Amino acid sequence: MARGLALILFSLLMVFGSAAHAEDDPIAALIQLNKQMIKSVKDGDMDSAQQTFDTFKAKWKKEEPSIKKENLSSHSEMDANIAMISLSFINQDARKLKTQLEELASHLETYQQAVVLKKTSSGQSRASLTAYIQSLKDTKQFIEKKQLDEASSAIDNLVTSWLAVEGDVVSQSKEAYTTSEENLALMKAEIGSHPEKVSKQIDEMIQLLEPIASSSYSWWDAALIPVREGMEALLVIGALLTMTKKARVTRSSTWIWGGASAGMAVSLAAGIGVTVLFSSSVFGENNFLLGGVTGVLSAVMLLYVGVWLHRNASMDKWREKINIQKSQALKKRSLLSFALIAFLAVVREGLETVIFFIGLVGKLPLTELIGGTAAGLIVLVIVGVLMIKLGMRIPLKPFFLLSMAVVLYMCVKFLGTGVHSLQLAGILPSDAESWLPSVSVLGIYPSVYSTIPQMLILLFLLIALVSEAAKHFTNGKELTK
């Protein structure tokens, strides 16, 4: 296992090292040309500004494909901005032209910062996190100057560039990682209505990230990544294995481990693909999208497991199911569902985990990286074995109640974090309600889009518990008659 892991990490080192050579800044000339246009317009020299704009457009056409590939959102904003500038030149509207050129300058500078954040190879990782912190400070300056449109654009770039630095952050501080992701969503939601809150959220992120930018790595950081990221998936897989063992369902472990293995393969392939085919800033929103979709799907499947557990919580029903050995069709359907849950649970965390490891390559000796990773995986294996062994010793009734509580807890958390990721990806609107609680460790965020579905799940749990208690009360009364 260690030898295979070493080969995988060595391959990732080769891939990451070859993919991380950054090109020269493709838009420095565009920024300079834009400054010349602003100066010409301020001086009232529209002819000179027009000539510079013609040069700018030629340069833009040349660089446009790479800009579009790097950050589609920024490209769309700048392309629309350039179209409006062309119209203002036709109308000879110097006042509008000056405003539009200044807005374009803001977009170009924000994009330039995002390109710097992309450069996360071994010699640039600390500079990247430092640059991210500087981008936070620049965003705060936009807010202080009441330039909210520029601040909103800068926040969008902070979100898409987060993937370039999150590996540095999560390996050093889980608190900084979860708080930063939560704040990014809140910043998107509140920049238009409560910029003063956004300013405080930026200060909090800076305070959390600055110590990390000056810290160093060790094998311990590599060991913590699989433990932190893999524990939730292990909890789901362990519960599934224990349930199917108690149910005496044949070949159940094959299906569940098959789903988990497929999830690991997809995560590894996607992680390598990200480093080879895409830049971090391009993949940033897509990573949030993937995390959101897998989170919500996992929640739906876990809710199915919760219903299944509730239906079989009765000892009589459970013995009846075991005695009659459910129909083969039902077995296959249940096993396929369990395999899919294992797959989603692994993919949900697996892709980010692979990217985190790729981010660590070059930041500490390869022997420490491999040794730390192996140590973390050994801890996961020990926890998994203990979980299954202890689960088999628990009596059937308490086991079902405990399993249902664990499954529904994971369901609530996966749903909350999934919706949160979809908001960061821009699929769902970002909102922040002051009257809603925020407990990131439970996947609870101050958003009605995540809180309402979570409340419905908790309502289901309450109804299930009340229903079960009512049945016991009714059966008890009948026995006393």
From Swiss-Prot:
InterPro entries: FTR1/Fip1/EfeU. This is Iron permease EfeU. Belongs to the oxidase-dependent Fe transporter (OFeT) (TC 9.A.10.1) family. The keyword Membrane applies. Its main location: membrane. Disruption phenotype: Severe reduction in Fe(2+) and Fe(3+) uptake and in cell growth. One of its GO terms (biological process) is iron ion transmembrane transport. GO terms for cellular component: high-affinity iron permease complex; plasma membrane. GO terms for molecular function: ferrous iron transmembrane transporter activity. The chain crosses the membrane at residues 258-278, 288-308, 338-358, 368-388, 399-419, 446-466. It is found in: Cell membrane. It comes from Bacillus subtilis (strain 168). It is a multi-pass membrane protein. Part of the iron transporter system efeUOB/M involved in iron import. Mediates the uptake of Fe(3+) ions, delivered by EfeM, across the cell membrane. Component of the iron transporter efeUOB/M complex composed of EfeU, EfeM and EfeB; EfeU is essential for the complex formation. Keywords: Cell membrane, Ion transport, Iron, Iron transport, Membrane, Signal, Transmembrane, Transmembrane helix, Transport. Residues 1-22 form the signal peptide.
